[in-house]
């Protein structure tokens, strides 16, 4: 079976950039580009960026985690932007909106335009996705059903993970 991403816009704004469709990864790209859904100004220092989407990934029919990684366009001669945690690791049980912590290392604000891609999604195990499935905004979808992990963001479990006693 295949590796597939499922992207669901959660705002009307995001629907503009993510119309319902199934995209076949003919080029066999490892990363799936993710759009910014609105114009943003990133101030020097730490910024929280909403992506206005939920994302799930499955490999061989089983839900799996994925990584959020910077694209090369994130850091250029004109702008010095990095992900605060280098790589965002998304648990298989997370069903909330994707958000980014981006640090603007420069001294001046940086303009980001809607439909600009700063990050990409990479399946756990670095499996090449076969399909990217864009769902309707209010579509009920089993991979987004409530889980014990839930919608809490940025390490919100407050626990040390599976090694707790």
From Swiss-Prot:
Its EC number is 3.6.1.23. The keyword Ribonucleoprotein does not apply. GO terms for cellular component: host cell cytoplasm; virion component. It catalyses: dUTP + H2O = dUMP + diphosphate + H(+). It comes from the Viruses. GO terms for molecular function: dUTP diphosphatase activity; metal ion binding. Homotrimer. The keyword Lyase does not apply. Keywords: Host cytoplasm, Hydrolase, Magnesium, Metal-binding, Nucleotide metabolism, Virion. The viral dUTPase may play a role in lowering the dUTP concentration in natural infections to minimize misincorporation of deoxyuridine into the viral DNA and ensure the fidelity of genome replication. Belongs to the dUTPase family. Gene3D superfamilies: 2.70.40.10. GO terms for biological process: nucleotide metabolic process. Disulfide bonds: none annotated. It is found in: Host cytoplasm; Virion. Its cofactor is Mg(2+). Induction: Expressed in the early phase of the viral replicative cycle. This is Deoxyuridine 5'-triphosphate nucleotidohydrolase. CDD domains: trimeric_dUTPase. It comes from African swine fever virus (isolate Pig/Kenya/KEN-50/1950).
């Amino acid at each position: 079976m295949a590796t597939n991403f499922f992207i669901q816009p959660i705002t009307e704004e995001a629907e503009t950039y993510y119309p319902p469709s199934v995209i076949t990864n003919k080029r066999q790209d490892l990363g799936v580009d993710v759009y910014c859904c609105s114009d943003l100004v990133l101030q020097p220092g730490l910024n929280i960026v909403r992506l206005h989407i939920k994302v799930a990934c499955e490999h061989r029919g089983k839900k799996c985690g994925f990584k959020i990684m910077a694209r090369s366009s994130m850091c250029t001669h004109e702008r010095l932007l990095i992900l605060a945690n280098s790589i965002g690791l998304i648990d298989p049980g997370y069903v909330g909106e994707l958000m980014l912590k981006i640090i603007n290392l420069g001294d001046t604000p940086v303009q980001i335009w809607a439909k600009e891609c700063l990050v990409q999604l990479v399946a756990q195990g670095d499996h090449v996705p076969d399909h990217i499935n864009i769902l309707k905004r209010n579509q009920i979808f089993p991979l987004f059903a409530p889980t014990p992990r839930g919608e809490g963001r940025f390490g919100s479990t407050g626990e040390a993970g599976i090694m707790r006693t």
